[in-house]
Amino acid sequence: YNTAKNLNIGIVLTAHPTEVKRRTLIQKYHSIIEILEQRNLFKNFPAKLKILNKRLFDELTIIWNTDDLKRVKPSPYDEARWGLAIIEDSLWDTVPKVYRRLNSIFAQNMKKNLPKNFNPIEFGSWMGGDRDGNPNVTADVTRKVILLSRWEAAKLYEKALTKIIRSYSMEKCSKKIQNKVGKSFEPYRVFLRPLRDKMRVTHRSIEQHLVYKKPIDQKKLLNSREEILKPLRIVRESLEQNQNENIASGELLDLMRRAKCFGINPVSYTHLRAHETREDLVCR
């Protein structure tokens, strides 16, 4: 148990174009998984199976007729964009599932739950930071890639928060939330909307800057992981105080674990300058 609590796993996403699957194909693979799951669910319903088999055939036909690789050399910005798509299409949902599965194993075998702040996995990347191997990677490219990463994170958090806000229609809440929102039949929704709105502002401001070169007002953006976690902790404490531990350990806990893992940038960026370092060493 203590070994698991102290795990520290660093995973680095490469920017090499030969290791990047086309997002179109990744989405097709997800569709096939969904169809296969539905086929198992409706195995005793011939009419439904016929429809699912047609969908499966269509998806496979499209995949067979789709090129695995893009035939145009990608820019460093494109490489980063494709890499971030992996987070949205796979890692964003996979990370909390892994933690939840691991927690189930410990709960079953050791009668202990993992700490609520359990977060052994961190993602790193040198997409947009490869100053050693790619002469097209400049300081401006790195800056844009980091902004793109923040844009991606804000978009994902906004979507997750919107889902929770729609779900949390409960009226009973803690005094801390009540003092913040005043009299409300939907205190959790009122309390979480400012955070969701700030995600939306962050997402749209960065998009306007990257597309139309509009200046960014950093004061209006989400600037730290703690800005996400603090209100979520207050909501979790309120739910636990009102005998709603099962709700607190559901989508809210998943979102908190995502926030701990990904922060405001889904990956931490490393600048590779090994070639310049070796040259400097030889000169000395």
Per-segment meaning from a language model:
Residues 1-278, 284:
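Often metal-dependent polyanion-binding catalytic scaffolds in large enzymes
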